[in-house]
Amino acid sequence: MKLEFYIKHYGKSFYWAGKFLKKDIFADCSILYAFCRIADDLVDNNKNSKSKINKFIKEYSNVKSKNIIINQFKKIQIKYNIPNKFINDLFYGIKLDTKPVKIKSKEEIIKYSYYVAGTVGAMMAHIFSTNHPKAIKHAIDLGIAMQLTNIARDVVTDAKLGRIYLPQNFFRQNIKVKDIVNENFDRNKLFAAITKIIIMSEKFYKSGNNGIKYLPRAIRFPIFLASS
């Protein structure tokens, strides 16, 4: 399966924005995206998700892996000097999804969004070869914003997987999976919580877009498209 497939199929906005990037940069972004997507899919699509992701992480830690995507990712990690911290934080976030998820607060959902998406933004910034110290922070915020958007969009789908990302303190009661899936549940309460997530995301989108000026000029327009 071609690496470009992962962005074309799963990240449509970035795929089309990527057409404005240099081919080598877009190819490296595709490797990063494929690496992250495969790890995430191990959690979403398998009953033995914990053992699957642990095996993937072990493969990554090996000097040479049998997994082509892992080997290609490790090459770009060296090429762009991507810190291990972001990979380790990504793995930590993905492993959180191997068990039922119930987020308690706004602070907790932001932290979770950093682990699973802010880290990806930071790694993308390294591929874009930005040397400005503020660029990474803004890239992390853009990743968080995109994850919050995904959470707002996929509330019911996530609930069916046993995951409630809407913070419990957004409600006046203990929200359970059956409440979200049940059509008889007060949808106004649910929509109000989703609206809060969307409002939260806007602050992070603003920060992410403010960071575009720190990127090389050739990168700015594609990233603006991807974040729009």
Residue map of PLM features:
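Catalytic cores of Mg2+-dependent Asp-rich isoprenoid enzymes
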Residues: 1-147, 152, 156-228
